[in-house]
Amino acid sequence: MNIRERLGKELLFLDGGMGTLLQAEGLAPGELPETWNIEHPEKVEAIHRRYYEAGSDVVLANTFGANVCKFHDDRYTVEEVIRAGIANAKRAGEQIGKETYVALDMGPTGKLLKPMGDLDFDDAYEAFAEAVRYGEKYGADLIHIETMSDTYEVKAAILAAKENSSLPVFVTMIFDERGKLLTGGDVPSVVAMLEGLRVDALGLNCGLGPKQMLPILNDLRRYTSLPIIVKPNAGLPKQKNGETYYDVEPDEFARIMQEVVKEGACVIGGCCGTTPEHIKKLVEECKDLPLRKIEKKHDTIVSSYGQAVILDDMPRIIGERINPTGKKKFKEALKNEDMDYILKEAITQQDKGAHILDVNVGLPDIDEVAMMEKVVKELQSVTSLPLQIDTVDGKAMERAMRIYNGKPMINSVNGKQVSRDEVFPLVRKYGGVVVGLTIDEEGIPKDAEGRVRVAGKIINEAAKYGIDKKDIVIDVLTMTISSEKDGAKVTLEALKRVREEFGVRTVLGVSNISFGLPRRPIVNSYFYAMAMQNGLTAGIINPSSEDMMKAYRSYNALMGFDENCTNYISTYAGTTETVTVQASQAAAAAGNAPKAAGVEMTLKYAIERGLKEEAHHITRDLIGTREPLDIIQEELIPALNVVGEGFEKGTVFLPQLLMSADAAKIAFAVIKDVLASSGQEEEKKEKIILATVKGDIHDIGKNIVKVLLENYGFDVIDLGKDVPPEAIVEKAVEENVTLVGLSALMTTTVVSMEETIKLLREKKPDCKVMVGGAVLNQDYADMIGADFYGKDAMQSVHYAQKFFGMVE
């Protein structure tokens, strides 16, 4: 029986940890676990068999790191270790006496994807695609993508799985206790994207014990209509007599996992620290528990990598300004590939209150496919707002949907057969919330009845592609009243009927209503209020228009969406009514965007927003009037502090943090060149060594820490990954370094971290050690003798500043 037929109908049991069991069998630090598929197949097979005997329905082949980005061994190819890994798992299940399944286990590449790192999305896709092809070729029953902390990387993996096999796809992500991914994603944004990509089951693994996963499981159940997978660690890692162990024993693990099943999980197993004993007890205690019914959810959600916007009864704003129509300067920016101009438009709208940004780059004389990809990627590096892909070019639409990190809005499909045939397959494949325009082969219906009819046709045709109506928003079209006197009445009637008759969400390009009229914002704002009252979910407007925002804020206050009128009061308390048109509003009417939401474009602002070109130009201008070191202390460092504080509070996400760091790096480079040409010396930089310890090839966290430390003025000596203790100590002595940062992602390599600390204490006793990594916590850091544990990159910066006396 295909595992899809059992999903959600019965409780399925996965296996537990592999790495610690291999280590117990003799796997040496730094040795690639996948090589044991070939060199010690009997030991790998025995571990799989123990899990099957414990009651696992599914075991994961020993292929977690089998991709070209991570697996580097001169003796064996990726194909060879996958073939052997699947064969070992299959042999283990042959004599079990029940139906068993083997999953191709796909872990992360160990690299950050662009723009945060240096791995291209297409290269990540190819790495996963190769593994998938071999997995299906050699008999895997399903693909399990696990321990993912980046939605962009997991999207590459899912597309690789879907496009290169017909196997079921399970996906589990690694969340922290706040319910956040490393790159900032939360539960609703992750669910929106994974469901859009049509995985078979989703959930969480690693990082946390079963008790800590319960709140996140509840969030998953709130948003997903899919079967939920839960694979916790056996609690928290500890050390005793030089051995790593986890603090949740099999009995306690099984007891808590009963709660996990009652709260909605229907595929369960274990991750780090769990053993066949944990799984045996898990099966004994949970096998007879009834499954909680999976409830179908009806939320209309669009998302970015770090933010979900739920289109519900409270109206939302779609910013209209990233569009060349009627905007001379924007057209020039597109032709000249002036990304900073476009990014400032995005930041302006975000600051003014937009929830989603419309993105249209259509010009006759540009390569729209390439430009759309470039603009989408650049926008996602500076804003966490979801995007609406606005194009009539099918190729541009597909490329944007493919490389977009999240679940976008798609603008648009219409009632014409040719449009439906082009757009609906893309929405089915990549996921998205698609805008349905009420126009068909007969044109735009003149009356509300006709537009409602076309809306119904779009919804019904979408269903044939498996697209639920929650992923459709209907645009009944706004016709200008200067040429159609009943245009507003027809639109409002159609709007209301679509909401009432189909129960779908709605969208309108509001400002179309006033073309050809004077003082357009007056008409626009009144029509906007009327549209919201008649069921408008999302208005495509200019959020820099004060008239429109007054209508929006007033409506929300009057309808109770703005609880206690908090937003209205915070915006208007202490202000007075004025008859003058604001500068930003006047600029918008003229087709020229304000510079940056009415904020003076300072170096500090440019760095906070990750505007690299602006940072370069402003720094060059400042050099002529201010001392270089004053610029660093008064502009650069305060800007980095603001971004760092936002990151710690969860209001700034990792991509924005790193883009700000890049902007600061460019400004630093300008200052450094000036100092060098004038014969001045830079201030002496304190040295810090960073290294991922012996046996560990994951250096994402270390690289993030490096970027931030360098921007705060430290001289970072990066020794790379898989670094022996002796090499770290030798460099510390040679360079007389007094602070070393060590990173480890894998439980099995924390022993190397402890050995490194002991050797540093012996050979360089004045050297302090800060540690970080997914498997660590404060207790564990204390046990291995570290001086400081940093749960994120900014904490490492703070410790370094205090250690060197840069702050109190």
Tell what function each PLM region has.
Residues M1-D475, M479-E808:
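Domain-level signal for soluble alpha/beta catalytic cores
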